[in-house]
């Protein structure tokens, strides 16, 4: 039996999908632009703080 592929980590989540990492690449900026144009409430993933 193989283990599940999704092993949640807040650090990895932010580093790969966070705002600053998106803005570092042209394609990431395109993602932000698309989501702004579409009127998304959340542009990138946010980690809820307890």
Curated annotation (Swiss-Prot):
GO MF annotation: an example: structural constituent of ribosome
Example of a GO cellular component annotation carried by this entry: ribosome
Biased composition, class Basic residues, residue ranges: 10-20
Lineage: Bacteria, Pseudomonadati, Thermodesulfobacteriota, Desulfuromonadia, Desulfuromonadales
One GO-annotated biological process of the protein: translation
Region (Disordered): 1-32
Record's protein name: Large ribosomal subunit protein bL34
InterPro entries with a match to the protein in the record: Ribosomal_bL34, Ribosomal_bL34_CS
HAMAP family per UniProt: Ribosomal_bL34 (MF_00391)
Origin: domain of life: Bacteria
Gene designation: rpmH
Family: Belongs to the bacterial ribosomal protein bL34 family.
Keywords in alphabetical order: Ribonucleoprotein, Ribosomal protein
């Amino acid at each position: 039996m193989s283990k599940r592929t999704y092993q949640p980590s807040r650090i990895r989540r932010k580093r790969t999908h966070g705002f600053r990492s998106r803005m570092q690449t042209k394609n990431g900026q395109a993602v932000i632009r698309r989501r702004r144009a579409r009127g998304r409430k959340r542009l990138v993933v946010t980690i809820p703080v307890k």
